Amino acid sequence: MDKIKPNVNNYFFKAYQQFGFPITIVRPSQTYGYDRIPLSVKGKSCWSVVERILNDQPVIVHGDGKSTWHCTHTFDFADNFIQLINNEKTIGQAYHNINPRFVTWDMIYHELYRLLNKQPHIVHIPSDLLAMSQKYDHTTAFLGDKQYSCCYDMSKIKRDIDHFDHHISIEKGLAMYLKYMDAHPELKIKDDEYNEWCNHLIDIYHQVEKTVKDNL
């Protein structure tokens, strides 16, 4: 998908230049909301990770957990997006509509642990190894995206709309998610298949670590 996006962008810009097609491209990075949050390795839903934390099972984070990431709540995205519509300044332009604050993956997970009153138990596994999974497609998510640190410039959108604001921090957004899930227990779907996969991968990874350590 990331390889296709530039070609699609160029197609629309060409339509604007040749025919006056009124295009405005908005790039949100990762958005999240009431029923989903930014996470590293997860199963069918985000709750699969939360459930492991609640059950005192270790969770998996790609790499060393130190790569940076922008997390944009859908409410904030919408507030700024509306100001880009019917705005003469934005026609024929592309914008980042992203929460300017960046955090590390470990910061996200540590805050989630704090909100759940649990002690962090994170297993860091290299992205290259995660991409070898035959059960889950981690190649696109990690090798193409999440393993890299991101830092976006929001000066352009700040210049062209009146009130650029991202007031929902990742801390507040995670708390909103947990509150929403408690109000909608039907969304707390168990994912036994993911749990078994995590446990198996963590066991194998610890065995590899021990073998390497014993033979260095």
Regions found by a protein language model. Name each.
Residues 74, 132-164, 183-186:
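Conserved C-terminal active-site "lid" loop/helix of NAD(P)H-dependent oxidoreductases
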Residues 1-25, 29, 34, 54:
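Active-site Tyr-X1-5-Lys
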Residues 33, 61-67, 95-102, 111-113, ...:
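Glycine-rich Rossmann NAD(P)(H)-binding loop
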